[in-house]
Design a protein with these regions (language model features):
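Rossmann-like AdoMet
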Residues: 1-84, 88-130, 143
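Short amphipathic alpha-helix with an adjacent loop that forms part of the alpha/beta core around
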Residues: 135-144
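A conserved beta-strand element that flanks and buttresses the S-adenosyl-L-methionine
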Residues: 149-150
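A short, conserved alpha-helix within the catalytic core of class I
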Residues: 157-170
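Conserved beta-strand signature within the Rossmann-like core of class I S-adenosyl-L-methionine
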Residues: 173-186
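Short, glycine-/aromatic-enriched active-site segment of Class I SAM-dependent methyltransferases
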Residues: 186-202
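Short alpha-helix
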Residues: 201-231
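Core SAM-dependent methyltransferase catalytic element
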Residues: 237-262
Length: 262
């Protein structure tokens, strides 16, 4: 019997993103996410809008390609690390990665209740049912391991104060940490809508120009580098290899920003 899921607002967007990954994995195959395929097959949910929303699909897949590459490389250089995946939704990256000692998936209680049904996790993969703005640091048991925090698909639904609060929680808990955080350009926040996301009453509310501008808002973190989602788009749409060289395209593309705690 299929699982009927009832969510609304930002939490419901996780159903759109996992559908995009499942569809790509079972179709064109630029990513391989068998867990996503399994989960979508278990759900009683109308994915009609997600099926038609090509912009959302392309963005999710591009982001997955780039973040998988960055995470794999970081874990290779930091064996035995702790990973905290903030706003995890139904993300399945923990099943595609190796080399970590403990992976924590964190999201709102209503979201984690759904995840627990579909992806019951234990051992080296744990679930934390808390807001990203709550003081969740005490849930992380390891003391001296390298730390990677991933914040994917979240900041564009928050306020500047919310984003600063999340980084304050990270800074309070960890002496050293690397953060991969996805951001949206402010111009895109004001003008762009994804059909399937908008239908869930989830609205884009905040953006930042680039990684250097983000670091200026944070007292305990320094900017390391940033990656445009065009890098991921180029994998399945080669024209983006050219477009990515144009500053106007890079500027409006979502960024994956790398920061380190100082």
């Amino acid at each position: 019997m299929k699982e009927k899921i009832k969510l609304s607002g930002v939490p419901e967007t996780m159903l759109q993103t996992i559908y995009a990954r499942a569809k790509e994995s079972g179709g064109r195959g630029t990513i391989h996410d068998t867990k996503a395929e399994e989960i979508v097959g278990k759900l009683d949910y109308d994915f009609t809008l997600a099926e038609k929303d090509t912009a959302m699909h392309s963005g999710v897949i591009a982001r997955t390609i780039v973040l998988d590459r960055l995470t794999k490389a970081w874990l290779s250089a930091h064996p035995g690390a702790v990973v905290v995946n903030i706003a995890c939704g139904l993300d399945t990256r923990c099943y595609r990665m190796k080399g970590f000692c403990h992976w924590y998936n964190l999201d709102l209680p209503e979201t984690m209740a759904v995840r627990e049904k579909l992806l019951p996790e234990s051992g080296t993969i744990s679930q934390i049912a808390m807001s990203a703005m709550d003081d969740w640091g005490g849930e992380i048991k390891e003391q001296n391991a390298p730390v990677l925090v991933v914040i994917e698909g979240l900041t564009m639904y928050l306020s500047e104060a919310d984003v600063q609060r999340i980084f304050a929680v990270i800074a309070k808990r960890f002496c050293q940490a690397t953060v991969f955080v996805e951001t949206m350009n402010p111009m895109v926040v004001k003008r762009f809508k994804e059909k399937s996301i908008d239908a869930n009453n989830a609205k884009f509310t905040w953006g930042v120009k680039n990684g250097e501008a983000l670091a200026e808002l944070l007292t305990d973190f320094r900017f390391v580098e940033e990656h445009s989602l065009c890098e991921g788009m180029a994998v399945f749409a080669p024209v983006y290899k050219v477009l990515d060289k144009l500053s106007i395209v890079r500027n409006i593309s979502n960024k994956l920003i790398v920061l380190e705690k100082v």
